[in-house]
Amino acid sequence: MKKKSGLSFLWLSAVAFVIDLLTKYLVTQNFELYESVNILPVFNLTYARNTGAAFSFLAEHGGWQKYFFIALALIISAVLVYLLRKNSARQKLQNSAYALIIGGALANMADRAYHGFVVDFFDFYWREWHYPVFNVADIAICVGVGLLILDSFKNGEKKANEQ
């Protein structure tokens, strides 16, 4: 009997992908560019466009970065799908991490390919200082990376206990 692989976690990628694109659609249909609605004393919904990567990295570099980030998202996603295929379904933390990163990377890639930029809208701030605006895909990627870090500590502990 063939054992189940980590590919069974790709549903999580699909959920992250759909939620991200749906929230971006809602923002673009209901907000003008840079329009901001205060939700909490430290949080706004603000429609912003990002042609770069996280924190607008490479945003002002003439357009080549669009293709670079599309290629990067495809390569990273392909590698992570390969790793999911090799993993056992029992590796829940690692598989969840890979799936979240794939969903977030592909959602931002789709946005970038369609619009030429990524739609961001979560705007946290304190007084005059604003954290860079981000989206659901960014959250999925960061949570995925956090789960990988947690998994590495758990596996490191497990290996240390086995010795």
From Swiss-Prot:
What is this protein identified as?
Lipoprotein signal peptidase
How would you classify this enzyme at the top EC level? hydrolase
Residue ranges of the TM segments: 7-27, 64-84, 99-119, 133-153
Molecular function terms, GO-annotated: aspartic-type endopeptidase activity
Q: Does the keyword Lyase apply?
A: no
Q: What does this protein do?
A: This protein specifically catalyzes the removal of signal peptides from prolipoproteins.
Provide the species name. Actinobacillus succinogenes (strain ATCC 55618 / DSM 22257 / CCUG 43843 / 130Z)
Q: How does it sit in the bilayer?
A: Multi-pass membrane protein
